[in-house]
Design a protein with these regions (language model features):
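Bacterial N-terminal signal peptides that target proteins for export
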Residues: 1-9
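Beta-strand-enriched cores of mature, soluble protein domains
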Residues: 24-168
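Sec-dependent N-terminal signal peptides
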Residues: 8-17
Length: 168
């Protein structure tokens, strides 16, 4: 009897844990863009401040696409990122938009991993405010290649899925 009770508890735990993961969906965006340095100042022998913009296009795994732009500032030490912060806007194919805040710390300049959070959105996308994502970026010359992954709720998935269903 005790063995069967332990087996039942293990089975229930597996079901509980599995059901908890069902509500999360991996929302993935691929972004490509061009970097333009606006200002650059030497802060010391090995430190540099940069202000730059990125502009480009994106697609996601829900059939959406659009354009995006970001304005960022970064402090570099020996070509390594000490601190990077930026704000940007992504506009979907139906002209709905989101505003994001991105950060990246202590990594090499040409590649790294950071976080993005949706801080504002147009009316039909309000449900995704607060969505947090991890991104990876690589640069080749002034070209940026991003992949961004977010764990989203079913409600957020529904909202984002509806973008591709609306007429442009």
């Amino acid at each position: 009897m005790e063995v069967k009770l332990k087996q039942l508890i293990v089975i229930l735990l597996i079901i509980f844990v599995s059901c908890g993961n069902v509500s999360a969906f991996d929302y993935i965006m691929e972004l490509h863009g061009k970097r333009e340095i606006i200002k650059s100042y030497p802060l010391s022998k090995d430190k540099r401040y940069l202000n730059f913009i990125l502009e480009g296009t994106f697609t996601d795994n829900l059939g959406n696409y659009g354009v995006w732009d970001v304005s960022s500032i970064v402090t570099l030490q020996n070509k390594n990122v000490i601190n990077l912060q930026g704000y940007g806007k992504s506009t979907y194919q139906n002209n709905e938009f989101i505003y994001v805040k991105g950060i990246r710390n202590k990594q090499e300049q040409q590649a790294g991993v950071g976080k993005v959070e949706v801080v504002n959105a147009s009316k039909s996308l309000l449900a995704i405010i607060g969505m947090s994502c991890t991104y990876a970026v690589n640069f080749y010359e002034e070209n940026a290649y991003f992949i961004q992954k977010c764990k989203i709720t079913e409600k957020q998935k529904e909202v984002l899925s509806n973008i591709s269903k609306k007429k442009e």
